[in-house]
């Protein structure tokens, strides 16, 4: 499996920057003052470069919501019990979660992916059962996942991206569900981006001050316990991550390897994106960070990455909700690029001075 993984990394290519001049010329020729569509023009530029097509298509969109449980939940770092994870998966399969509403509104299909929920689901049209294990191990006592499990989870995400490409999808989005998953995400940020634990540890599902301090201590313990196994991004992901985070990482790598853009959701999904970036910095050309999460630390994380999220709505739900919203902004940007008239083709005078 390591050979397949390395092949995927080798397949991620930087975008062809030689197209920039032609894309910018088209944007400037649209019937509007130059630059007047602001960031929509930047988004259109990035989408065009990611696809490598001067007339890119955006026919079908899909949100992947990766679900998994976490061994560290036994440490009491969340306001909700672990059984909420499968309950929320059932809610999504019934169409009643926020991500169902927002993905429908965005015209995007939704797949829920069981990467490691501590529950056995029956088959469902919207459920992809890709379970690596029934929940990760407690990272405060040792590695959350084995290296083989980590690679399996990553390659599952890669396969889903490649399958989506073959099915005609042009834009993907990440989402997640997993009680206690802000804890491994925070540990990954601390390790991969060298950020202080206290600065980036938030309240997740709404913990009080006492539990917040306990959560910080658990994350520090996990970093200490696993300190000998944090030399590479893959080791960091295995020791401190989770099955859904590794799946998101794989989806991003897989999409980038076939020139497909991905809209990244919030605090948890960004951890999968950071892991992908650490494994291949070239994936940055294919990423749209959807929104600035209200979870503490996300702004510092975005600043460290030099990323500017599309939206800022104080969201902190996860599931892919922010990504589903931002997908619509990306789609609007592409439509403006493709469908607006140009000064060259329309009977509109350009700027006179």
From Swiss-Prot:
The UniProt record lists the keyword Glycosyltransferase: yes
Active site as annotated: 319
Keywords: Cobalamin biosynthesis, Glycosyltransferase, Transferase
Hydrolase listed as a keyword: no
EC number: 2.4.2.21
Catalytic activity entry: 5,6-dimethylbenzimidazole + nicotinate beta-D-ribonucleotide = alpha-ribazole 5'-phosphate + nicotinate + H(+)
Top-rank lineage group of the source organism: Bacteria
Example of a GO biological process term: cobalamin biosynthetic process
Pathway where it operates: Nucleoside biosynthesis; alpha-ribazole biosynthesis; alpha-ribazole from 5,6-dimethylbenzimidazole: step 1/2
Gene Ontology MF term list: nicotinate-nucleotide-dimethylbenzimidazole phosphoribosyltransferase activity
PANTHER family assigned to the protein according to its UniProt record, in alphabetical order: NICOTINATE-NUCLEOTIDE--DIMETHYLBENZIMIDAZOLE PHOSPHORIBOSYLTRANSFERASE (PTHR43463:SF1)
NCBIfam families, A to Z: cobT_DBIPRT, PRK00105.1
Function: Catalyzes the synthesis of alpha-ribazole-5'-phosphate from nicotinate mononucleotide (NAMN) and 5,6-dimethylbenzimidazole (DMB).
Family: Belongs to the CobT family.
Name of the protein described by the UniProt record: Nicotinate-nucleotide--dimethylbenzimidazole phosphoribosyltransferase
Originating organism: Prosthecochloris aestuarii (strain DSM 271 / SK 413)
């Amino acid at each position: 499996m390591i050979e397949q993984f390395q092949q995927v990394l080798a397949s991620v290519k930087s975008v062809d920057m030689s197209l920039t001049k032609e894309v910018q010329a088209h944007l400037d020729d649209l019937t509007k003052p130059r630059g007047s569509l602001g960031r929509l023009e930047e988004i259109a530029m990035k989408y065009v470069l990611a696809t490598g097509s001067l007339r890119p298509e955006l026919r079908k969109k899909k949100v992947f919501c990766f679900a998994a449980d976490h061994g560290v939940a036994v440490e009491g770092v969340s306001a909700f019990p672990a059984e909420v994870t499968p309950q929320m998966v059932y809610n999504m399969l019934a169409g009643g979660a926020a991500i169902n509403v927002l993905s429908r509104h965005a015209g995007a299909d939704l797949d829920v992916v069981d990467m490691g929920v501590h529950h056995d689901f029956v088959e469902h049209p919207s459920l992809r059962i890709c379970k690596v294990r029934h929940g990760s191990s407690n990272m405060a006592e040792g590695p959350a996942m084995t290296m083989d499990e980590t690679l399996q989870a990553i390659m599952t995400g890669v396969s889903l991206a490649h399958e989506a490409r073959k099915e005609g999808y042009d834009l993907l989005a990440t989402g997640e569900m997993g009680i206690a998953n802000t804890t491994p995400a925070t540990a990954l940020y601390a390790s991969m981006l060298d950020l202080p634990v206290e600065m980036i540890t938030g309240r997740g599902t709404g913990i009080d001050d006492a539990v917040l301090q306990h959560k910080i201590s658990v994350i520090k313990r996990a970093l200490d316990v696993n300190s000998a196994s944090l030399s590479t991004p893959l080791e960091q992901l295995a020791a401190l991550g989770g099955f859904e985070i590794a799946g998101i990482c794989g989806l991003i790598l897989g999409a980038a390897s076939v020139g497909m853009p991905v809209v990244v959701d919030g605090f948890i999904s960004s951890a999968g994106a950071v892991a992908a970036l650490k494994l291949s910095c070239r994936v940055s050309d294919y990423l749209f960070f959807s929104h600035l999460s209200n979870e503490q630390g996300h702004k510092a994380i975005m600043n460290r990455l030099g990323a500017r999220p599309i939206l800022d709505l104080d969201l902190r739900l996860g599931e892919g909700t922010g990504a589903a919203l931002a997908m619509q902004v990306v789609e609007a940007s592409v439509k403006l690029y493709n469908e607006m008239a140009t000064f060259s083709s329309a009977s509109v005078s350009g700027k006179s001075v």
